[in-house]
Amino acid sequence: MNWYQLTKKQVLEKLGVTKDGLTSQKAEELLQQNGENVLQEGKRKTALQVFLGQFADLLVIILIIAAIISMFSGNIESTIVIFAVIILNAILGTVQHINAEKSLDSLKSLSSPNAKVIRDGQKIEIPSKNVVEGDLIVLEAGDLVVADGRIINNYSLQVNESSLTGESTNVDKNDGDITAEVPLADRTNMVYSGSLVTYGRAIVAVTGTGMNTEIGKIASLMNAAKEKKTPLQESLDKFSSRLAVIILIISAIVFGLSLLNHMAILDALMFAVALAVAAIPEALGSIVTIVQAMGTQKMAKENAVIKDLKAVESLGCVSVICSDKTGTLTQNKMTVQKIYINGESIFEEELDLNNQSHRYLLYDMVLNNDSSIVDGKGIGDPTEYALLEPLRKLGYNEEDLRSVLKRLEEVPFDSDCKMMSTKYKLHGENHILTKGAIDAILDRCDSIATKDGVRPITEADKADILRQNTEYSENGLRVLTFAYKQTDEELSVDTEYGYTFLGLVSMIDPPREESKTAVADAIRAGIKPVMITGDHKITATAIAKQIGIFKDGDISVTGMELDAMSDSELDSKIEKISVYARVSPENKIRIVEAWQKKGNIVSMTGDGVNDAPALKKADIGVAMGITGTEVSKDAASMVLQDDNFATIIKAVANGRNVYRNIKNTILFLLSGNMAAIFAVVYASLLALPVPFEAVHLLFINLLTDSLPAIAIGMEKPEKDLLAQKPRDPKQGILTKEFSALMLCQGALIAVVTMTAFYIGLQVNAATASTMAFATLTLARLFHGFNCRSKHSIFKIGLTSNVYSLLAFAAGAALLAFVIFVPFMHPLFSIAELTGAQIGFIGLLAFIPTVIIQLVKVIVENVKKSK
């Protein structure tokens, strides 16, 4: 059926819907009958495919080769255990992959769009997945079209359909009839799922949902979802590939040295195998992904939903946050304070319906307004539903007025024209009602409403109005200007002149209680907070001073002043500009680019359709979850579920903490592996027996190491985390300092391991290997406490991370099980140990931790003395 060829009446009849929309009961029946309004995703890998994919890794292939060599050397028990560990690793990798998919799905559901629909005669907001055929959707600028539909009422609607047609220009829509058969791009009385509303408003009858939409027909092409890796994951992949090559080269050298030392070929091969197993950080990739996933889940619980994992890494580098004022730094709870009308400033309670000026102002406040209050809850823009309260306090309801007076035309609010206008028939005459910024409206007025009626406006009147506007603004109040025009002309932005000035309405939107603390935390963290707002410059600066963004010596500029600046002038002033007022979308992009040119990582917040380009341009685009348009959410890499600036600072702290934990986890794993490598190479150079069986090292790497590594990844943010400067994004994890630390700590553990090996050799090779294995395992378990933080354990507290204690206990229990349970001995090539040997192992294993902690204490005391 071609819905676009049917008249509006025919469409409503076929869908069985009236102007009051579907009933809730009918909508629920249709939802059960036709299913949710979602696109079917492209086929995901099955669990078996994911499992088999684990064996395609180069490092795993090296382990398989090691197992085969072990088998040919006659060590069947070790071969079985190596293969068992490889399979266990594949199972863990599969479980982790499936859990990661589930985590991402839950994050997607948190950021999925809502839709405004008319049901039971009332406008309500519902999740887009619950939209059904026959629903009447209310579309406004900034909305994402969530279903296909026929336009029933059109108010200057413009839509971007590039996702379907490839055409990037906006399409003017209408509610007229089309009789001929036309291509999709010419169906101007229809809207399609996946499109973006860029201007205007419309009521649409839904004709297709889910896979029955135009975009659903090509869903199979769109949903071949490719898994994207973050820069850190890609960096670790490259590191693993390079490591595999280095392992092969060093193993070959060790094999050659062993042969030169007249070692048997199979023994030499076992040396090479031991080295390969020692060097491979089997759990590294999985653990890093787990730590990132835990970080994003924690952020989601704290109202910051990460849409792109790259944002987690970038958050730790943020040096500038460009934030909206309204709702982000303020409470977004608008209440009318004072009203300037008839030349005097009055309270809302003093409005009188018998006064013509007051009555027309109330008309403008209530009729020239798209919001409503249902069951005490405001629906729409907070500024707009605040304007409904004065009429309600007079004992009337906005619907009482709207049911009698019908809107004839409208020009929706636009950030360029900074005003909204509608046409109504009042007292038998057509009137245009308008509201907006004073600089957009006052110059359009040629008359003013007074107690004695309407008269021409004078320059003295304008001076009084501007003076009152400044007084309100200096007190941190948001001010809207109201005017009207009696005319039969068609409503248009270009012809909106000849207005009668009605008055100013000031509203207060107090700063959030936590904003001042959050701004102070940002500054302490080396982050420059910048306020960007569409509000008046004086109002914005007053709020910025209250919360600490604007300091002595700082500058505030308007969008027009910014336009007048050259790039070089902006470059020289940008670090002093703390407030941008009355800005355009182009201004926002220019501000982001100017900061980025100076090498900064920039976060930009936004909620409107016109904010999308700036959100994409910023390193981290942050959309508002409550007031944000679906267009802005689609462009952002992070969505704030509470629209709160303080949540951004929490997310920055969490981003820094995730990166720090990953870095500490990698240090723990690689320093432990370096200890094993040093031990094997040392033994090879001195023609000593192989200090470890391959199965020993696999046991350490996969079982006892994994638990402390995950515990390190769960370390809480330290108190001084926000006292540090933002991380340089160009600086990788494997810095010279990191490498030196890794090698030194690895060498310390290797020394005590080889000491235990020498002592064991006095008995026999099996005892030596067992003592080396036990010492290395226990030393690495102790080492988990060292890698929790750069600070000493005395400063952070032994019990501040209970997971690290549990990980140590579990790892030690696993080691004890292998050492003390006889039937495990042949599987792990374990010799029985005496009580003295076990005591000596415990003492040796603890030495590296004592030394490392002692160094940390000395460094802390030196820093304190400075």
Which residues make up each language-model segment?
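Conserved cytosolic headpiece of P-type ATPases
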Residues: 1-723, 733-734, 747, 758, ...
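Alpha-helical scaffolds flanking conserved acidic
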Residues: 361, 767-768
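Generic alpha-helical transmembrane segments
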Residues: 704, 749, 770-784
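Membrane-water interface at loop-to-transmembrane-helix junctions
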Residues: 728-747, 766-767
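C-terminal catalytic subdomain
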Residues: 752
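Long hydrophobic segments that form regular secondary structure
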Residues: 757, 763-764
